[in-house]
Amino acid sequence: DSVKYKLATISRNMVDVFQKQSDVQVTIFLVAFIIILIFVMSLYVYKKRRLNEKNCNDLDKIYDAFPLISSMNPREEKNTYLLRDYYIKTAYNSCCGGEFKNDFVNVCALKKCIQQGARCLDFQIYSVNNEPVISTSSVDDFFIKETYNSVSFSDAMNVISNNAFSGSTSPNSQDPLLLHFRINSTNKDIYNKMSDILQQELSDRVLGK
């Protein structure tokens, strides 16, 4: 009986040791997992916070100078046709310097489009807090914008007013400029606000009737 008791005691002690080791291993695993998870999440947040600035820096590296183009000379015979007869360099989603989804929009991208000679500037317009803003989306839906931020319509038009018609910021500043708005909203208020902003920023640039 004493032998059986000793064997049973030894068995229980061994089980307790294994259980304790197992608990320690589980604890170590959980702590390591939490540390790794925090590190990965911190790295993700850091990269996302820098993404807006990175997009602008990347554009500066790619487009570091004016292209070899200039404004049209209306006296040249090749420039006497109708507007419809020309190909016009166009920038799609002109405030987007990265992806259309899970990214940022910035006026630095708009400035680069102007600097590179785009004379048709495209924008996707949304209504946020009853104000017209510029954003992007990868889906065709009035109610979904997929960027982390937005650019106010007023800021974008101010950039155009200050950059698109100056020889120091546009290589073809004397060429006609077309603005293409894809308005993703049924909010009538923003239409009036857009009209007021255009009148304020670009009234002296509008082609006469």
Predicted regions and their residues:
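Long, acidic (Asp/Glu-rich), low-complexity accessory segments flanking structured domains
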Residues: 2-120, 126-209
